[in-house]
Amino acid sequence: GDGLPDGEVRDVYRELDPGSAVTLALRARGRVLGAMSVYRARGRQLMDIWDQETLSEVADRVALALDSAALQEQERRMAEDLQRSLLTAPPEPDHAEIAVRYVPAVRAAQVGGDWYDAFLQPDGATVVAIGDVVGHDTVAAAAMGQLRSLLRGIAYSTSGGPAHVLGDLDRAIEGLQVHALATAAVARFEQTSEERGRGETRLRWSSAGHPPLMVLAPDGGVQVLATERADLMLGVHPTAARKEQVLPLPWGSTVLLYTDGLVEGPGLPLDDGVARLAGLLGELGDRPLAELCDQLVARMRPGGSEDDVALVAVRLHPEDRPRPPEAGPTIVPRVLPPVG
């Protein structure tokens, strides 16, 4: 016991007072990961060669298990780093305040495919997207990064509406052989001069099998934007027609996009979760936007979620007056001059 460190280990060793011991190195892939010591009480037969061979096999298995666990943790962290690097802060245009939240699953070993994005198209419209790739591993995280980048590139380069963007994305998934299934919703906030004069912003949205958007009106009423027929997920049928819905919204409205981890789980069917979220949105709707997002997550998932949760909230403001103090400053990309 002289080689043991001071503290609890040495105290336990003295209490057990073993008569013999064998210490074996834990090796895996040419690296020493640690050591395993086995003790036998005084008065018992000393360990023989057979005991040592058995213990050597046990040590090999322990080392492999430790090495596998370390590799899985490294893989999980890499996927999580990739995921978080893509979930960037949103822009803050004059006409809208945008708040985003991402909460990983409570089971640390899982990395999901939830993602969100918000950006301005060249014509000044604001696009908000959210999605969920099927799976909870590095493959799902990598596919999430591909789909998010593809959607952003398509929406920015074409200035297309949500249905057009989702249709092009579905065809890109097929043509580029991105092996993924995913749900997604895309919302575009746009204004004409006439709409601006009426104090309205037009919401144009399309869904690919994603949970329905919600709208909180300035008077506190909540509208769940469910479609009559569920749209196909991405990656199922690349030539499927995508539907687009349009809704004029008065300034002061709040639009909520979220993934199913917020509204579905053990003991909480999806429809019940959507109804509960709509009730909470109406109850908490007068809160500042960042606080609203935090409260919705805390109230819907007080003990955490077994699935990732992504949430995007957009609150519309007039363009002809300063942004409210709680909305923070305007932050938008620099406008580049046209090429040529």
Locations of regions flagged by a protein language model:
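Low-complexity, intrinsically disordered Gly/Pro/Thr-rich segments
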Residues: 293-302
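Cytochrome P450 core scaffold surrounding the K-helix E-X-X-R motif
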Residues: 215-218, 266-270
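Signal-transmission/dimerization alpha-helices at domain junctions
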Residues: 29-36, 41, 45, 52-75, ...
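… and, occasionally, acidic/histidine-rich disordered N-termini of signaling adaptors
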Residues: 73-256, 295, 306-340
